[in-house]
Amino acid sequence: AAIASIAVHELGHILFGRIVRRKADWLAIGPLIIYRDGKILFRWKHKYFGGAVFLYGEAITNKEAYRKEKIKAAVSLLGGPVTSFLSGFGFLYAGQNNEYAFYFGIFSILIGTGTLLFTDGLPAILIFTNSLYAYYYFLSVELMTSKEEKQFDFLLKELRGELQKVKADSIEKISLTCLGALYFYLYCSQINFNMTSREGVKIHQYILNEIKHKGLGIFKNKQKRSVLTAIVYLEEMNLLMEGNAEAAETLYAKLADADDRRLYELKRDA
């Protein structure tokens, strides 16, 4: 019953996605992954049994397309919880004397509630209330689709504008969403061979300067430290591709020195 309720939930995403003309790239139920081209893989990555589906829509090239895709994305995101609730209450009502129907209904309602509050409902809300998150979300979707031609220009331009609005006097006060958005901006700009665009992003320069002085070891949040490390690696790659090997080595050396000092301080305090 639990596995069936997970499958119905994910199929709900696909059904509502199809209604608004979004395509499914792959569907995962536990270790089973079914791709759009019919390829099936068995891969166990997690310690728990869950489900996921990856949907994408038309390329966003202007404001009007962006507005439409926000609505379509929200519909497909909420399609899973809605389907879980409908099937859950339906089975509880229609199969009152059936044990399987009872458990399926309970699991479906629990899955619908959990995903509505955390995994599906929250992104659907943020897409409309947080422009930085919305551009970050659609840029990551465009990057991970199986489409041969990926169009980043509009999303990169708009995301850059949102990143310029971010103000913080320390990396600790910068949200993980903002750091993730910055990483995707830098990565996609690198794909477009537009590395120089990063130089005008104030938050990027501020982050690099703080890391050079404090190192990465000072940041306790593992997720944040992981994203910061990825941002630094991208900067080193950009410097190397620009033929500025000396600056890349200097950046690496300062990071190493700062981390060594931080490690020494931690050992001394202990």
Which role does the model predict for each range below?
Residues A2-N62:
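Small-residue-rich helix-interface/hinge motifs
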Residues S140-T177:
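Acidic, Ser/Thr-rich low-complexity segments on the non-lumenal side of membrane proteins
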